[in-house]
A protein has these predicted regions:
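Helix-loop-helix
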Residues: 47-54, 147-161, 231-304, 309-310
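Pre-NBD coupling/linker segments of ABC/ABC-like ATPases
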Residues: 313-324
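ABC-type nucleotide-binding domain
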Residues: 325-570
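Transmembrane helices of ABC transporter permease
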Residues: 10, 14-27, 59-62, 68, ...
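An intracellular "coupling" helix at the cytosolic face of ABC transporter transmembrane type-1 domains
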Residues: 10-13, 98-102, 118-131, 135, ...
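Membrane-integrated ABC transporters
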Residues: 1-32, 36, 44-60, 65, ...
């Protein structure tokens, strides 16, 4: 938690004022038992009504001043905690944005969402309570004990014994609950993951009538979360009753000892009442402190999870490699292995691309097509070898500048909630309506959008109100808006009919700014007219050439072509 407190830096005044005003309130609270003792011993005992009324006035004044101090403390604590939460969330979001695909894959989307929402809220609540109670509760506990020593040292030893016993209990409970809360958060990640997957894949689940299995799996994970929460909760719940038992036993001993001392004249009735009130104050504050420690335990567990994200360093390598390539794009002995993967996804890939070339990438499922094109914008580091873009090692280039030259359309079409215009401006922030319309026409989706309401048509979350083909074409249009130097279409026309795909492909080939195009597909028809076709099989390059050359020289390509067009065509 200490490493995250840097986000309180802008709230130093509030972080100091909140506990100070709480200490002021606590000071007034410690005076109250002495005033009550005086009322009993001097006012009631002597029948002095004016004395009683004056002391009651002091009690009212103490209550009002204490209330004002408490409200002020709450204001400062809330301001500091909410500011801390905002800063923490913002920094965490920026950190996540800076991570490479490797780290994002490793951490998992659901876990990151939980850390951004649930964990940050828990830490924020912990900071709020710490500012209000961490000094106040111990101050009253030890203050009440000191006041008790001033009244009667022997009776005050009862206070000391109770506090020592409770400290031992709190330590033992925290030793168990701290790791327990970490397991709770881990189980919450698991529940969030399956919930997210089920909502996103609801249509697939229903298509395979697999609802009962998914419900059973959700219930299993939910039960694991619930059981862990119960397990930790049972231990945490012991804190309050044990505190009550210890304090109430201490009160019984105190009242008995006080009564004996009153009989022999060592204490007055008012002093016994004052001791009782101090013991009651200790009880209340220890209950608050116990709950605070439970909250702190949760906050520490969540803070560790957040801290682990901040400690993640991007594994993308950057260097000053001055080696150049004579080709616009070149893969030189490139291999790729994903983190925690058993096998290589790509092995010893070599090819060159000239500026303005159209490159087809074809192969079966899992052959490494997407892995290959993801190395061009430096989404991942090659495990071996070098990838050159514009003649330079991608590791020596600024990632943002490199990616601003690339239009990348991924396999899964991702659209954001908002208008068509808003989505298109992801490709180019200052794109005019004419730029957007031109891109929509190139992607063969302009007429469809016009029928739906034009550029102001509102796209639902995840593009739920669009078909798969419409989402794919809008994704292509978004990439075309920026007029990229390199256009990568990663199986981005799989949901299109052949005629629409052919029209879109012809439009891209005829672009006046002549981009270098990578077309990834399992369809031979999508890559037949490319200047160069790269054939992948199990992560290895088994053929490079034109369509005609590969039909004669590459058995894998020929098999793909024959399976789609028939033997006579080949």
């Amino acid at each position: 938690l200490k490493s995250l407190l840097v986000y309180l830096k802008g709230y130093v005044k509030e972080s100091i004022c909140a506990p100070l005003f709480k200490l002021l309130e606590a000071s007034f609270e410690l005076i109250v038992p002495l005033v009550i003792a005086a009322i009993i011993d001097k006012g009631i005992a002597n029948g002095n009504t004016s004395y009683i009324l004056s002391r009651c006035g002091i009690l009212v004044l103490l209550a009002i001043v204490g209330m004002v101090a408490a409200i002020t403390a709450q204001y400062f604590a809330a301001k500091a905690a909410t500011g801390f939460g905002r800063g923490l969330r913002s920094a965490l979001y920026q950190k996540i944005q800076s991570l490479s695909f490797n780290e994002l894959d490793n951490l998992g989307t659901s876990s990151l969402i939980t850390r951004m929402t649930n964990d940050t809220n828990t830490v924020q609540n912990g900071v709020n309570l710490v500012l209000r109670l961490l000094l106040r509760s111990p101050f009253i506990v030890f203050g009440a004990m000191i006041m008790a020593f001033f009244i009667d040292a022997k009776c005050a030893l009862i206070f000391l014994a109770a506090i020592v016993l409770l400290s031992i209990v709190i330590f033992l409970i925290m030793a168990y609950t701290t790791p327990g809360y970490k397991k709770v958060q881990s189980n919450l990640d698991s529940v969030t993951l399956i919930t997210r997957e089920n909502y996103e894949g609801a249509r697939v689940i229903r298509a395979f009538t697999d609802e009962s299995n998914e419900i059973a799996e959700f219930n299993r994970r939910n039960r694991a979360l619930s059981n862990m929460q119960k397990k930790v909760g049972k231990i945490s719940s012991l804190l309050n009753p044990i505190t009550y038992v210890i304090i109430n036993i201490a009160i019984v001993v105190l009242v008995y000892s006080g009564g004996v001392k009153v009989n022999i004249g060592d204490l007055t009735q008012g002093q016994v009442v004052a001791l009782y009130n101090y013991m009651s104050q200790i009880l209340v504050e220890l209950i608050k402190l116990a709950n605070l420690l439970v909250t702190i335990t949760k906050a520490l567990a969540c803070a560790d999870r957040i801290k682990s994200v901040f400690e993640q360093e991007s594994t993308l390598d950057h260097n000053d490699n001055k080696a150049n390539s004579n080709s616009y794009i070149e893969f030189e002995n490139v291999s790729l292995k994903y983190r925690n993967a058993g096998d290589m996804s790509l092995t010893d890939i070599n090819f060159t691309v000239n500026k303005g070339d159209v490159i087809g990438v074809i192969g079966g499922t899992g052959s490494g097509k997407s892995s290959l094109v993801s190395l061009v914008p430096h989404f991942y580091d090659a495990s071996n070898g070098t990838v050159y873009v514009n003649g330079c090692d991608v590791k020596s280039l600024d990632d943002d500048k490199l990616r601003n030259k690339i239009g990348f359309v991924q396999q899964k079409s991702v659209l954001f909630k908002g208008t068509v215009r808003d989505n298109m401006k992801w490709g180019k922030k200052n794109a005019s309506d004419n730029d957007i319309i031109e891109a929509l026409k190139l992607a063969q989706v302009y007429d469809t959008i016009q029928e739906k309401g034009g550029l102001d048509f509102f796209i639902a979350q995840g593009g739920a109100n669009l078909s798969g083909g419409q989402k794919q074409r809008l994704s292509v249009a978004r990439a075309l808006v920026r007029k990229p130097e390199i256009l990568i279409l990663d199986d981005s026309s799989s949901a299109l009919d052949f005629a629409t795909e052919a029209r879109m492909r012809d439009a891209i080939y005829s672009l006046d700014y002549n981009p270098t195009v990578f077309i990834v597909s399992q369809r031979a028809s999508s890559v037949m007219s490319a200047d160069k076709i790269i054939v992948l099989d199990d992560g290895k390059c088994v053929g490079i050439g034109t369509h005609k050359e590969l039909l004669n020289s590459c058995e894998v390509y020929k098999e793909i072509y024959v399976s789609q067009f028939g033997k006579e065509e080949a």
